Regions:
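Bacterial Sec-dependent N-terminal signal peptides
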Residues: 1-22
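Carbohydrate-active catalytic/glycan-binding domains of CAZyme proteins
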Residues: 20-172
């Protein structure tokens, strides 16, 4: 018993000797990286990332000659930023998918909740865009639009579909 007490005390002292205090430093990002000041031949080169900044969980689809990109917005409102591109390099902000409070009830959500991993799809047969996502704490839902620049439907909740990161598949 005495040996066990001495061994335990020795281990506690050794663990305490190895403990170090965490050190934190200040971080600031102003959005003007020097790398973007280096000239490139834009006829066949581009900067990577093509979208610098906060664009988590990207999903894209193509309709005609235009690509559509959506990203997670978590508990920020309006929700799900939408961008368009003709070449997958030059992107233009095109508003948000969830622009009405009725589309995304965020009241009472913590910062770690909200809209995660939206997926955008285009169905050629009915010429309709669909955006499906998970509202953490409220479930999976989708919205649809014939023209993303003119707004999206009210959400259609998938009450019997659990899980996260849903996506649509349209068979040709």
């Amino acid at each position: 018993m005495k040996k066990l007490a001495i061994l335990s005390l020795s281990m506690m002292l050794a663990a305490g000797a190895q403990a170090q205090n965490a050190q934190f430093d200040y971080f600031k990002y102003a959005g003007n990286d020097a790398r973007f000041n280096v000239p490139i031949d834009k006829s066949h080169q581009y900067y990577n990332p093509v979208l610098a900044g906060f664009y988590p969980d990207p999903s894209l689809c193509r309709a005609g000659d235009t690509y559509y990109l959506v990203n997670s917005s978590f508990t920020f409102f309006p929700g799900v930023p939408l961008s368009t591109s003709k070449d997958l390099v030059n992107w233009t902000p095109a508003g948000h998918v969830l622009t009405r409070q009725s589309q995304v009830p965020l009241k009472g959500q913590h910062v770690s909740g909200g809209i995660f991993a939206p997926a955008i799809s285009y169905n050629k047969k009915n010429k309709t865009f669909y955006m499906i996502t998970t509202n953490v704490g409220a479930g999976n839902f989708f919205v649809k639009s014939k023209d993303p620049s003119k707004g999206w439907s009210e959400p259609i909740y998938l009450k019997k579909i659990d899980g996260i990161d849903p996506s649509f598949f349209f068979d040709d």
